[in-house]
Amino acid sequence: MESQQLHQNPHSLHGSAYASVTSKEVPSNQDPLAVSASNLPEFDRDSTKVNSQQETTPGTSAVPENHHHVSPQPASVPPPQNGQYQQHGMMTPNKAMASNWAHYQQPSMMTCSHYQTSPAYYQPDPHYPLPQYIPPLSTSSPDPIDLKNQHSEIPQAKTKVGNNVLPPHTLTSEENFSTWVKFYIRFLKNSNLGDIIPNDQGEIKRQMTYEEHAYIYNTFQAFAPFHLLPTWVKQILEINYADILTVLCKSVSKMQTNNQELKDWIALANLEYDGSTSADTFEITVSTIIQRLKENNINVSDRLACQLILKGLSGDFKYLRNQYRTKTNMKLSQLFAEIQLIYDENKIMNLNKPSQYKQHSEYKNVSRTSPNTTNTKVTTRNYHRTNSSKPRAAKAHNIATSSKFSRVNNDHINESTVSSQYLSDDDELSLRPATERI
């Protein structure tokens, strides 16, 4: 009989991953009326032994035991309150039943044979090689016709996985969860599951399968005990015990927030202002940083903000340091008002400087080129000013030429003067009367 065979081979129950969820009653194909009265008690005793053995037999896993590593005990997770997990492209309950996942609603019964652990710290079953999920970037998408014949097959490895994939350490406290989840995400990426992990924008490259979800659930439960999880993680898991992907998505978002906090502190500590930008722009930049830190429960006092701003002032704004050095009650709004006042004064001065310089230069040019002036020095200086851009050789040539020309003109003027005087004397002699010669 079948029950007697089970009694004779009790180890056959351990060969299946679903031994812990089989029925407690062993059906028999034999007609009970055909059994003699003498054999009925023995049949009952055998059935009782088999049933008692089933009750005492612990649930086994399809992952072979590794004597070099002790796997942490899975934490107790509360049962789901909002029904089955239907997100992220998971299998429907009908498909799960058809795939022998009969106990989809019970987290303790989510057996996942070769997905249970990482290949780095458990030796996988040679009959069930660990599949990899990330195809190479150069490979084309598979033919949809061939997908129908691949439901019953075990996925083959598409890319290599390093042999040094290390498991994440076990979570030890609620405060260390943000650090622990970084190692857990790195562990999933090294296990070729990085394309189902949300990126910085909360986006994923593809939908995960039910087996991948079971693998993520089991490893998360094994290394993160429920009583050590933060409150916000417990709230998510109490609504849906298996929604690990939402936990990872919010964890990535919180990482980005922490990185932004660090960037804001660095920007606030390195503030610099010299008036090259408008005072309004500087005030908006500083106020935005302070408000962003305040939203993350980090309050920056006015005194601290004023000290950081004063440290970065330069140029005409530098004297504000001495003004605020002895002040104990610093107001950020007052400091911004004084910076704005100095900026406006400098702006007005810069607008008036070009017009004053233009009027003064025009007045100088008119005085130098006035036709009524008799000052030759001004004209000569203006002449040399126009040729100031010429090289020294050209200047020397011009000076020599001008001196030679002036010397020739002077000689010509002297000769003309002498000749005119001589002619005048001759005229005077010719006009004298003859009586005067005697």
From Swiss-Prot:
Pfam families per record: TYA
Top-level division of the source organism's lineage: Eukaryota
Cleavable signal peptide: none
Keyword Cytoplasm found: yes
Site-annotated residues for Cleavage: H397, N398
Subcellular location: Cytoplasm
Region listing for RNA-binding, in residue ranges: 295-397
Residue ranges, compositional bias (Polar residues): 1-11, 19-39, 49-60
GO terms under cellular component: cytoplasm
Tagged with keyword Cytoplasm: yes
Compositionally biased intervals (Low complexity): 369-381
Keywords: Cytoplasm, RNA-binding, Transposable element
Major localization listed first in the record, in broad terms: cytoplasm
Chain segments carrying region Disordered: 1-86, 360-403, 418-438
GO molecular function, one term: RNA binding
Domain comment (free text): The C-terminal RNA-binding region of CA is sufficient for all its nucleocapsid-like chaperone activities.
Function: Capsid protein (CA) is the structural component of the virus-like particle (VLP), forming the shell that encapsulates the retrotransposons dimeric RNA genome. The particles are assembled from trimer-clustered units and there are holes in the capsid shells that allow for the diffusion of macromolecules. CA also has nucleocapsid-like chaperone activity, promoting primer tRNA(i)-Met annealing to the multipartite primer-binding site (PBS), dimerization of Ty2 RNA and initiation of reverse transcription.
More details: Retrotransposons are mobile genetic entities that are able to replicate via an RNA intermediate and a reverse transcription step. In contrast to retroviruses, retrotransposons are non-infectious, lack an envelope and remain intracellular. Ty2 retrotransposons belong to the copia elements (pseudoviridae).
Description of how the protein assembles with itself and partners: Homotrimer.
Protein name in UniProt: Transposon Ty2-GR1 Gag polyprotein
Chain's gene name: TY2A-GR1
